[in-house]
Amino acid sequence: MGVSTPVIVPRGGAPVPPGPDQDLILGQVAREIEEKGFVLSNVDSLVNWARAGSLWPMTFGLACCALEMIHCACARYDLDRFGTVFRPSPRQSDVMIVAGTLTNKMAPALRKVYDQMAEPRWVISMGSCANGGGYYHYSYSVVRGCDRIVPVDIYVPGCPPTSEALLYGVLQLQKKIKRTGALYR
């Protein structure tokens, strides 16, 4: 078994391959430890990296889009490989995927479940019905977009959207989490 040399990535830059440039960076870190006794770093980026790699979505399947959401968790697309594990409880999850038609009677329940989720929390709106009412937009009993009830971070278009589209939405959410600069939203 071989031992691999770590690749250093300076903040905001490209990875530095093993060699003299990496030795310079390691030398600077070693000098800083000798002079000050500690190294200053950004904890936010580490925490956001960990959060992005371990999303726990709560399924809020309301209509036919929920089938595509379930399909995305099965063997072909396997969201588990991205650290995404579906949770049945809002207290255990940090992402809510709203999939399907949101009615006026269901809107208070959606808000209640959202409020039960711990901070920081994110919402993915999946499908035309969740995004803006979809086919039932002009019905008296349909909310014209779940963003009127909860703040939405990622919109996944389609009727119903494919599993690939939801997978792309999850990857976009991971990028968004890594970009944020605060520990709390």
From Swiss-Prot:
Q: Does the keyword Translocase apply?
A: yes
Which superkingdom heads the taxonomic lineage of this protein's source? Bacteria
> What's a Pfam family in this record?
Oxidored_q6
Please state where this protein is localized. Answer: Cell inner membrane
Enumerate the GO terms in the molecular function aspect.
Answer: 4 iron, 4 sulfur cluster binding; iron ion binding; NADH dehydrogenase (ubiquinone) activity; NADH:ubiquinone reductase (non-electrogenic) activity; quinone binding
Q: Which reaction does it catalyse?
A: a quinone + NADH + 5 H(+)(in) = a quinol + NAD(+) + 4 H(+)(out)
Q: What class of enzyme is it?
A: translocase
InterPro entries, per database record:
NADH_UbQ_OxRdtase-like_20kDa, NADH_UQ_OxRdtase_20Kd_su
Cofactors (names) = [4Fe-4S] cluster
Q: What is its main location?
A: membrane
Return the GO cellular component terms, semicolon-separated.
plasma membrane; respiratory chain complex I
For this UniProt record, the keywords arranged alphabetically read as follows: 4Fe-4S, Cell inner membrane, Cell membrane, Iron, Iron-sulfur, Membrane, Metal-binding, NAD, Quinone, Translocase, Transport, Ubiquinone
Key word Membrane present: yes
Q: Alphabetically, which GO biological process terms does the record hold?
A: aerobic respiration; electron transport coupled proton transport
Note the topology in the membrane: Peripheral membrane protein
Q: Which family does it belong to?
A: Belongs to the complex I 20 kDa subunit family.
Briefly, what is this protein's role?
Answer: NDH-1 shuttles electrons from NADH, via FMN and iron-sulfur (Fe-S) centers, to quinones in the respiratory chain. Couples the redox reaction to proton translocation (for every two electrons transferred, four hydrogen ions are translocated across the cytoplasmic membrane), and thus conserves the redox energy in a proton gradient.
Quaternary structure (record) = NDH-1 is composed of 14 different subunits. Subunits NuoB, C, D, E, F, and G constitute the peripheral sector of the complex.
Q: Which PANTHER family match?
A: NADH DEHYDROGENASE, NADH DEHYDROGENASE [UBIQUINONE] IRON-SULFUR PROTEIN 7, MITOCHONDRIAL
User: How is this protein named in the record?
Assistant: NADH-quinone oxidoreductase subunit B
Q: Which organism is it from?
A: Rhodospirillum rubrum (strain ATCC 11170 / ATH 1.1.1 / DSM 467 / LMG 4362 / NCIMB 8255 / S1)
Q: Which gene encodes it?
A: nuoB
